[in-house]
Amino acid sequence: MFVGMLILSVFGITFSLKAVERPIEVECPLGGSNAKGWVILGSYHSGVGLDGKQYGAHVQPNPPPECPDNGFLVYKENFSESELIQLRKYIFSEEYQSMWKNTAPAFYRLAKIYEYMGESITDHYYHYVIATWEYDYPPFGKKYSFYTLEAIEVLKKTIGIMRSNLLSETQFVEVHYLLAEL
C-alpha cells in the first residue's frame, strides 16, 4: 500500500511539473492563414538565471502567434491602417523574409519589427536576450555567437540611452547584469 502511494505521489509530482499550454489562433492582419501560437496557462519554475531565463518545465516565454504564410508575429491585438502599411513593407522585405526563412529566433525578429516601427530600444532590448536562449548550448556555437553579439550591442546602446535619459535605476542595473551575463 505504502509503495503504491509513493509511486502515485511521484507521478503526481511529475505531472504537476509540466507546463500547461493551450494553442491559440488569431487572424493574421497581413493576410493569409491565421497566425498560430501557444499561451502559457501555468508552469513550474525551479530557478532563474542572471539573464532572466527561467528553469523548470517551461524555460522561456512563448513568442506571439506567427502567421504561417509570411512569418509576421502578431504582437498586439489591433493595428491601425498606417501601422499595417508600414508593417507590410517590412514583413515582405527581402531582409525580414530572409530572417524568417533562415529560422531566426522569433524574439529576434520581434525585436527587429519593433525597431522598424520606431519603438524605443529601452522597451524591447530584452527580446534580443531571449533570442540567445534558443542557441545557448552546443552544437549552436556560431548562431549563439551571432545572437549574443547582437544582444551585447543592443544592451550597450540601451545603457547609453538610459544614462542620458536618467531612466529607472533598477532597469539600468538590470541591463548591466544582462550585459555581464552575456
Question: Residue spans of the language-model regions?
Answer:
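Alpha-helix boundary/N-cap detector
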Residues: 82, 98-105, 146-149
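Amphipathic alpha-helical repeat scaffolds of TPR domains
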Residues: 88-89, 93, 101-142, 170-182
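Bacterial N-terminal signal peptides
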Residues: 2-12
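Alpha-helical repeat scaffolds
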Residues: 106-113, 144-163
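N-terminal cysteine/histidine-rich coordination modules
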Residues: 15-92
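Short Fe-S-cluster ligation motifs
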Residues: 59-65, 99-106
